[in-house]
Every structure is written in structure tokens, then in C-alpha cells.
Design a protein with these regions (language model features):
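Non-catalytic membrane-proximal stalk/linker segments that position and tether the catalytic domains
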Residues: 2-10, 55-68, 135-163
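A recurrent flexible, glycine/aromatic-enriched loop bordering the glycosyltransferase active site
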Residues: 59-84
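Conserved nucleotide-sugar donor-binding catalytic segment
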Residues: 76-80, 84, 90, 94-101, ...
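Generic non-transmembrane alpha-helix signal with a bias for helix starts/N-cap capping motifs
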Residues: 82, 106-107
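Catalytic donor-sugar/metal-binding loop of nucleotide-sugar-dependent glycosyltransferases
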Residues: 98-101, 107-130, 135, 139, ...
């Protein structure tokens, strides 16, 4: 279970966060686009979980992370260092508890937010400047659980051993 702290911006927006974000930058970000903000590229998560390319349309442009950008749409959320609007967290239901890995739960949250709920998860360079690198390992069983839950029923027999 992820324990999140609460921050209220000067405009009254209620945000939930994990880690130690730059609050001045965060107050500015909350006035604009985005529902989730993170700095996961610097934390070792850039282009993690490339196996997703085998289960989604190749034209789905959010599959790859871009180089040399300060802000970009990215569903690769670090569960130890991110910020989310409280209303969005409650609407989507937070991280899915079916996964053993917190990282897979965070990725599934980001993909679900972007793909199914019209939300915008944003990578923001420098929002979490003191966050350290994390392991990008996702257990195979969690990968299978993800594919089983999020893709066509015709693929499910392949993943039937995941329960």
C-alpha cells in the first residue's frame, strides 16, 4: 500500500505526493496541464518495460520516451517519487493491488490513466532532484498479470497460468 502525503496549493488544489518534490515548481505545475507529475527519467525508468510494444499498436506514440526534453507525457511513474491530483487518484482508484511489484502498480496506473481515463501523466525534469535511482526490474509474473488484465480476451489463454 502506498502512503501519500497531502499538499494544498495556493489555488486550493489538493495534491497527493510521495517523495520530496520541489513545492515551488509543483504549485506552478498544478495550475497547468497534467494530472500526475514525476521525474522518473533521471531515476532510471526511461524506456522501461519495452515488452509493451508487443501488445499495443505501434503507432501508440506514448510507448517510447524522448531524449533531451524538460517535459513530456510519460506513464512510467516512479512509485517512490510522484505527485497526483487527489481527485484523479480517487477517480482511478490508486495503484492496483494485484501486482507484487510497486513499480508495476505505478506503471499500470500511468497507462490506465493515459489510455482509458483521459488523464495526463507528465515527466518534469527536476521536480524530484534528490530522488535516487531505483531498480527497473519488473517480475515476469507481474508482466503477465498486466497483459492479462489490459489486453484482448483472445490473448488470455496465453496468460492463464498467472493466477
Amino acid at each position: 500500500m502506498t502512503t501519500l502525503q497531502e499538499h494544498t496549493t495556493p489555488n486550493g488544489d489538493i495534491l497527493l505526493y510521495s517523495g520530496a518534490p520541489n513545492f515551488k515548481m509543483l504549485d506552478t505545475l498544478a495550475q497547468g496541464a497534467g494530472d500526475v507529475w514525476h521525474s522518473s527519467f533521471e531515476q532510471g525508468l526511461k524506456n522501461t518495460f519495452p515488452q509493451l510494444m508487443y501488445q499495443t499498436a505501434v503507432h501508440w506514440w506514448y510507448l517510447n520516451d524522448f531524449n533531451d526534453v524538460d517535459t513530456a507525457i510519460s506513464w512510467r511513474i516512479n512509485p517512490e517519487a510522484f505527485v497526483v491530483r487527489k481527485s484523479v487518484w480517487e477517480l482511478v482508484g490508486g495503484f492496483d493491488a494485484i501486482y507484487d511489484s510497486k513499480l508495476m502498480s505505478a506503471f499500470a496506473f500511468g497507462i490506465n490513466l493515459l489510455r482509458n481515463n483521459g488523464g495526463v501523466p507528465l515527466y518534469v525534469k527536476g521536480l524530484f532532484s534528490d530522488a535516487s535511482l531505483i531498480s527497473s526490474h519488473i517480475p515476469k509474473l507481474d508482466q503477465y498479470k498486466f497483459f492479462r488484465k489490459h489486453f484482448k480476451a483472445t490473448y488470455r489463454p496465453v496468460y492463464r497460468f498467472c493466477n
